[in-house]
Amino acid sequence: MAKAKFERTKPHVNVGTIGHVDHGKTTLTAALTKIGAERFGGEFKAYDAIDAAPEEKARGITISTAHVEYESPSRHYAHVDCPGHADYVKNMITGAAQMDGAILVCSAADGPMPQTREHILLSRQVGVPHIVVFLNKADMVDDAELLELVEMEVRELLSKYDFPGDDTPIIHGSARLALDGDQSEIGVPAILKLVDALDTFIPEPTRDVDRPFLMPVEDVFSISGRGTVVTGRIERGIIKVGDEIEIVGIRATQKTTVTGVEMFRKLLDQGQAGDNAGLLLRGTKRDDVERGQVLCKPGSIKPHTEFEAEVYVLSKDEGGRHTPFFKGYRPQLYFRTTDITGAIDLPEGVEMVMPGDNVKMTVTLINPVAMDEGLRFAIREGGRTVGAGVVSKIIK
C-alpha cells in the first residue's frame, strides 16, 4: 500500500494525556483515534498498540512515549501518551513532546490523586499553556452529587496552580464505553464534546517562523575580505539581509547588522526557523562572538544568571549519578550550544536529591545566558548528562 501523504491542509496542534496511573489515559487516547477516524479521518489505534509505547531518547534520557494522530473538523492533532509516571516527568521536563495543551484524565470514581496534582504542577512549571479535563469512568458513579464534588476538587486543584479552574472545560464520560461504540451521553458523544473543547479552548499555537528571530551560535568563522560569519540552526523567526540584530549572552549585549545570509554555500535573501544558516555580520570581529551566545531580534530576549528550574535527575540505570547531590552542587549546565557552570540551591527542607528524583531548584550561573521561561537545559558532569531541566521562573 502506498504511504499516505501528510496533508498540511489543517492547522497542526500538539496535545497529550496527563493524569494519575489507571485513570484511563490510554483508553481515552484509543477512543479519540477511533472516533476521530470514524468522523473526521485518520486511523484508529487500539489500546494495545498505544500501550506498547516505543522507547526514544531525548537529551540522553530514555523515555517511552506513544505518538498518535487524529483529526477534528478544523484541526490535525498530534497526541502523546506515556505508559508510566516517570515517563511523564521526563517527557515534560525535557520537552521531548512539546504540548500546546493537555487533556487531564481524572477518574470520577477516585477523584484527584497524587499524580493528578503532580502532573498539573509539572504542566505549570514546564509551561503547558492550557488544560482541558476529561472526568473518566463516569459509568461507575451513579450519584450526580459525587460527580459534582469531584469536578469541584479538580477545578480547585487547577486554580491552585494558576490555571483558570472556573473556566476550564470539564467533560464527563467513559472512554471504555466510547471505545465500545456506546451512544449514550457518556459514550461517543462525550468524546465528540472533548474534541470540541480542544478545538475551542486550546488556541492555535504561534508557529516558530512567526516568532521573533533567534539563532544560537554554533560556530564563528572569519572570512578574509568579507568579515565574520556565524553559523547555527535558526530556532525561530525570519532573518533578512539588512536586519539589525543583537548578540546576547556570556558578555555585554552587542548590536550589529546582518549583511548576508547563506545556506549550503548559496547566498539567500532570508533564512527562517529550521534552516541551518550562516549569517555575515557587519563590523563584527571573530573574537566578538562565541558559541553559547544567541543572535536575536533586538530586545526580544535578555541575558540572565539566576532562575528557578524543574529538574529530573537521571537514575543510575540511565547512566546518571550513583550518589545523591546536596546544596552547593556545581555542575555544568548545557544551554543550547554550550556548558556554563552553575551553583545549585535546593528548596527549604530538601537536604539532598537522589538519582531518579525530580526536584525544583534555584540555579546561579557564573555567566549570563539568553533565556526565556520554558528554556530546556541538560545538567552535565565531565561531558555526560546527569539530569535535564527547564527554566520555570527567571529571578534575575
From Swiss-Prot:
InterPro entries (alphabetical): EF-Tu_GTP-bd, EF-Tu_GTPase, EFTu-like_2, EFTU_2, G_TR_CS, P-loop_NTPase, Small_GTP-bd, T_Tr_GTP-bd_dom
Region entry G5, spans: 174-176
Binding site for Mg(2+): T26
Protein location: Cytoplasm
Molecular functions per Gene Ontology: GTP binding; GTPase activity; guanosine tetraphosphate binding; translation elongation factor activity
One Pfam family cited in the UniProt record for this chain: GTP_EFTU
Residues where GTP binds: 19-26, 81-85, 136-139
G1: annotated segments: 19-26
Top-level EC class: hydrolase
GO cellular component: cytosol
Keyword terms, alphabetized: Cytoplasm, Elongation factor, GTP-binding, Hydrolase, Magnesium, Metal-binding, Nucleotide-binding, Protein biosynthesis
tr-type G domain location: 10-206
Catalytic activity: GTP + H2O = GDP + phosphate + H(+)
Chain residue ranges for the region called G3: 81-84
E.C. numbers: 3.6.5.3
Residue span of region G4: 136-139
Predominant cellular place of this UniProt entry's protein: cytoplasm
Function: GTP hydrolase that promotes the GTP-dependent binding of aminoacyl-tRNA to the A-site of ribosomes during protein biosynthesis.
HAMAP family according to UniProt: EF_Tu_B
Entry similarity comment: Belongs to the TRAFAC class translation factor GTPase superfamily. Classic translation factor GTPase family. EF-Tu/EF-1A subfamily.
Assembly information from the UniProt record: Monomer.
Name of this protein: Elongation factor Tu
